[in-house]
């Protein structure tokens, strides 16, 4: 069950380009052991507390789009997170909703964590825009080409302003309509 769940989540439910024939072969072998793929999927994706769904709705209402750069971002302050009884994991996957918007190739979520006095940043892309390099160059973070993370010790507003200012250095690769 755990292996299936890990492969399913890491491949975006098998939609990411990194999903290969071998991925499906491994999954086929796991299914032969009698695990229920629908039970695992339901446990992970259809098992949200009501506050998490409310947080998702709120976060999506705050999405900002930078149309000329095919970029969007969401910011959530600690106060906003607390309003929805935030628990670790509640924001998992929210950043991916930005990539479902037509022509968006770069999506970011900024989350204030006042306990650690940092801003947690999750970056996602589709196509040829390398968020690993962006994350590394701008915030000292890392990950891989289409998914990365970072931490900022600046305030939420200063982190977002730094991000927005940094986008100008990536204008050409972001403006490209090639996704």
What are these regions (language model features)?
Residues 1:
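Acidic/histidine metal-binding catalytic segments
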